[in-house]
């Protein structure tokens, strides 16, 4: 009887592993890098290797997520503005266009969740989750539906800070529960002008939300997935700054940690919200999401000015692990670089190379274990308008999506080499693709694409 239970458990574990490989449940799982798969194409266009393309009503920059035959995306209806490709703020330079978009006095927006069929692109269902006016203004290239949803395979969990909304929806489109997410009490915080962007994280039966878009207050909270019950919340004042970095659940041999890059530092908590360690020394604006590769944690912040630090951290730390003046490493900081971080895109580690994409169209590679430069900043295309989406990689190729809708394909290796570009003809902003089941699901400004080999 006992041996039968062991066999059953092993079968269940193997099925779980297969299932996980077939799904893309949240923002940048696997840190944007997937195993080699001959089914995945490296060339496509507006018609070549396009399995389907469908319109997505509304505006939103959340990334698509996939579970089985379901493709989920969010958007907001009523926001008729359409962002245009163009350089974002970087290197401390002011933009040439207005940066803030105020909410009209009579605004009435609808926050939507869409479920598309993975095989055909057909809309399975759509669900309105909330209606009303956004609580804050936004940056002119942001949206009021920028956060990526998450799923545990049974429900989709949607968080949109401009609506004060946290909701759980099952795979048939039924709203299971909703919860109003309170903003900091009036007087404790100024209203940030940029809008939010940090997506939720999920671990077992817990959802983690972070809010760092207010200039002088920050909070981190956990909720139960079953009913949306609040489990704990930390709220603190901070030195003026803004952040949009998604929290990261770091599982390693010693323990499970919740990592945030905010408040001008890297913070680690256990899943019950107890502080484990912190590292001071980030810049005032944090956007890239922390991630782990080959046993190391990568955290960075790249705006404003010349101070753009990257920190590579070993597991097992406790307390304050901040570098002393003049140090670039210590017991738990494997290496650091004060001028390597990007502003919007999150970097990737691929084939032992830390690859960094800068919004102004520059690309670098460093040894992921030591920080040694493999090659310095290389210009991708002088004609490109800017890069906001995070890179991804597979099959010895690195993919860089410009806001013009061009995806540049690089050969991974010690030399900078562009092989070709795939033009999609529609703006790509901060949405990263889902790479699953031998296909890519890419979100452009108005459409959702399934890229897959259609010819052999």
Label the model's feature ranges.
Residues 18-456:
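Noncatalytic, solvent-exposed loop/strand surfaces
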């Amino acid at each position: 009887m006992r041996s039968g239970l062991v066999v059953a458990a092993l079968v269940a574990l193997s099925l779980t592993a297969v299932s996980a490989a077939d799904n893309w449940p949240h923002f940048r799982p696997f840190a944007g890098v997937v195993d080699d798969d001959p089914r995945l194409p490296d060339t496509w266009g507006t018609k070549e290797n396009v399995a389907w393309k469908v319109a997505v009503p509304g505006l939103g920059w959340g990334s698509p997520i996939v579970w089985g035959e379901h493709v989920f995306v969010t958007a907001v209806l009523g926001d008729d503005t359409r962002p245009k490709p163009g350089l974002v703020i970087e290197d401390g330079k002011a933009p040439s266009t207005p940066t803030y978009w105020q909410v009209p006095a009579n605004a009435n927006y609808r926050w939507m969740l869409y479920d598309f069929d993975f095989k055909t692109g057909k809309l399975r269902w759509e669900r309105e989750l909330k209606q009303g006016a956004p609580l804050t203004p936004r940056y002119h290239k942001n949206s009021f539906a920028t956060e990526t949803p998450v799923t545990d395979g049974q429900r989709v969990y949607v968080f949109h800070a401009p609506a004060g909304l946290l909701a759980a929806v099952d795979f048939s489109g039924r709203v299971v529960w909703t919860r109003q997410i309170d903003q900091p009490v009036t007087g404790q915080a100024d209203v940030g002008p940029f809008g939010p962007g940090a997506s939720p994280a999920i671990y077992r039966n817990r959802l983690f939300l972070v809010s760092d878009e207010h200039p002088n207050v920050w909070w981190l909270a956990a909720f139960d997935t079953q009913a949306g019950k609040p489990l704990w919340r930390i709220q603190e004042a901070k030195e003026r700054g803004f952040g949009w970095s998604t929290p990261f659940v770091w599982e390693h041999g010693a323990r499970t940690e919740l990592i945030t890059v905010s408040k001008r530092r890297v913070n680690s908590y256990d899943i019950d919200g107890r502080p484990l360690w912190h590292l001071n020394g980030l810049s005032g604006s944090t956007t890239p999401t922390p991630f782990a590769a080959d046993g190391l944690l990568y955290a960075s912040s790249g705006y404003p000015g010349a101070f753009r630090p990257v920190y590579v951290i070993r597991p097992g730390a406790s307390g304050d692990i901040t570098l002393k003046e003049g140090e670039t490493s210590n017991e738990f900081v494997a290496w650091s670089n004060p001028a390597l971080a990007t502003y919007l895109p999150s970097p990737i580690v691929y084939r032992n190379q830390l690859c960094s994409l800068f919004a102004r169209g520059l690309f670098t590679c460093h040894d992921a274990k030591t920080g040694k430069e493999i090659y310095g900043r290389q210009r991708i295309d002088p004609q490109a308008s800017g890069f906001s989406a995070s890179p991804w990689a597979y099959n010895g190729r690195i993919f860089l999506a410009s806001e013009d809708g061009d995806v540049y394909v690089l050969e991974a290796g010690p030399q900078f080499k562009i092989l070709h570009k795939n033009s999609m003809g529609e703006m790509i902003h901060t949405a990263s693709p889902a790479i699953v089941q031998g296909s890519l699901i890419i979100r452009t400004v108005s459409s959702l694409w399934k890229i897959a080999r259609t010819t052999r």
